[in-house]
Amino acid sequence: MAELEQEYLTFLLQGEEYGVDILCVQEIRVWSSVTELPNKPSYIKGVINLRGVIIPIIDLRLRFGKEALEYNEQTVTIILRHQANDRTMVVGIVVDAVSEVYKFDNQSIRKAPAFGSNIDSCFLKGLASIEEKLIILLDSKVLLNEDDLYCIDKAEANASNIAEQSVLQANTESKQANEVENA
């Protein structure tokens, strides 16, 4: 019986190579600015409007507790799509650079070692080696954590409420100014 192979898009973060299931990759985009939202974790950079869909953008370096890096011409955003609980989640992850696409069968993917309770390995799906490289395979389901997305939804709602309040206040002040002039 033939072993099923799965393709992974690999990318770089601080010199390490990571991979995500290519079936979860919607597209790869060059880095472009985002709309920042208030009251969000530092690794959530903000949101973009991609063909009418608002997509949260997460800096994977910061999410993994790595040192921040100034974005450059190699910095890309990988748009990931995942279906969970009858809900489609779409999130962009900012990475240093895209590397390659590799195929791995289940036999070549090793389980991530247990690091103890001090190290969070929940993102790890496994490890795969190709030639002399070790590639860290990420679990997209965990990467697209709904709790993080809830924080973004909440921040978006707060930003929308603040904008509405500002417009109402400006309208009220304008009416009051007109009434004073007409009096």
Q: Which positions does each model-derived feature cover?
A:
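An acidic, low-aromatic, low-complexity terminal/linker signal
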Residues: M1-A183
